[in-house]
Amino acid sequence: MAAEARVSRWYFGGLASCGAACCTHPLDLLKVHLQTQQEVKLRMTGMALRVVRTDGILALYSGLSASLCRQMTYSLTRFAIYETVRDRVAKGSQGPLPFHEKVLLGSVSGLAGGFVGTPADLVNVRMQNDVKLPQGQRRNYAHALDGLYRVAREEGLRRLFSGATMASSRGALVTVGQLSCYDQAKQLVLSTGYLSDNIFTHFVASFIAGGCATFLCQPLDVLKTRLMNSKGEYQGVFHCAVETAKLGPLAFYKGLVPAGIRLIPHTVLTFVFLEQLRKNFGIKVPS
């Protein structure tokens, strides 16, 4: 009798990403604060101390509902497309996809996920940035759904997709860095014969993937955050890039350290959770 393997269900990526987001949300919030500074005034530790001192420890979880909403749109979409297509194509070809096909599939999945997740991403950035604004300038969204409703009512439906081009481009890059590079790294690690398909292998492969994703998407991440948090002062992506460049070339990598500190653990946790979901609750298929 043939041994049985398991493949992920289409929604496992969204669930795993939500679990990871709950663990890394404070780092994501600090990253947004650092990126939206007009001048480099505070580093990561200083920003964390200021947030806690001003609004309390729970302020580090400001916007968590929007972050979870984003994961259940953006991450669920890209994981569902990538894993469903990859598993079906690989099943027909009797072997893993070549790396260039993984990159292409990751790009398409990320573009779709980035577009679908733009409204939740917009609200997520605003809710995280709210705690550093003066009381009179805060938007004070009660939760993610309230934020989505108020943006649509007060600013129009088009505003919900402000920065969609940038979010989709960033989604493509981070998905290539995470999903495509994770698959390839895991394949290479297993091919050495020194490690089996266990949690340590998942950790090593996802750590590599997190580093790749951070390197690829940081410049776009800075521009996306500035566009979404703007009040109309930028005419588009190019104008935002020009204005950011005036602050110096390193402005595109503002918040790089907290971005890496946040994205690498987030990537590791996402894939560890995903692999455990697949192993214990995945769909059984003949191996």
Swiss-Prot record:
Transmembrane stretches in the record are 10-30, 63-82, 103-123, 163-182, 203-223, 255-275
The Swiss-Prot or TrEMBL record annotates one GO molecular function as: succinate transmembrane transporter activity
Which Pfam families does the record cross-reference, listed alphabetically?
A: Mito_carr
Q: Solcar repeats located where?
A: 8-88, 101-188, 197-280
Tissues in which the protein is found: Present in high amounts in liver and kidney, and at lower levels in all the other tissues analyzed.
User: Is the keyword tRNA-binding in the record?
Assistant: no
**Keyword field:** Antiport, Disease variant, Lipid transport, Membrane, Mitochondrion, Mitochondrion inner membrane, Primary mitochondrial disease, Repeat, Transmembrane, Transmembrane helix, Transport
Example GO biological process:
malate transmembrane transport
Reactions this protein catalyses = (S)-malate(in) + phosphate(out) = (S)-malate(out) + phosphate(in); malonate(out) + (S)-malate(in) = malonate(in) + (S)-malate(out); (S)-malate(in) + succinate(out) = (S)-malate(out) + succinate(in); (S)-malate(in) + sulfate(out) = (S)-malate(out) + sulfate(in)
Q: Name one GO cellular component term.
A: mitochondrial inner membrane
The principal location of this protein is mitochondrion
Q: How does it sit in the membrane?
A: Multi-pass membrane protein
Explain the purpose of this protein. Catalyzes the electroneutral exchange or flux of physiologically important metabolites such as dicarboxylates (malonate, malate, succinate), inorganic sulfur-containing anions, and phosphate, across mitochondrial inner membrane. Plays an important role in gluconeogenesis, fatty acid metabolism, urea synthesis, and sulfur metabolism, particularly in liver, by supplying the substrates for the different metabolic processes. Regulates fatty acid release from adipocytes, and contributes to systemic insulin sensitivity.
Family label: Belongs to the mitochondrial carrier (TC 2.A.29) family.
The record's annotation in PANTHER family points to: MITOCHONDRIAL DICARBOXYLATE CARRIER-RELATED (PTHR45618)
State the associated disorder: Mitochondrial DNA depletion syndrome 19: An autosomal recessive mitochondrial disorder characterized by progressive and severe epileptic encephalopathy, hypotonia, poor spontaneous movements evolving to spastic quadriparesis and dyskinesias, and respiratory complex I deficiency and mitochondrial DNA depletion in skeletal muscle.
What's the protein here called? Mitochondrial dicarboxylate carrier
Species of the source: Homo sapiens
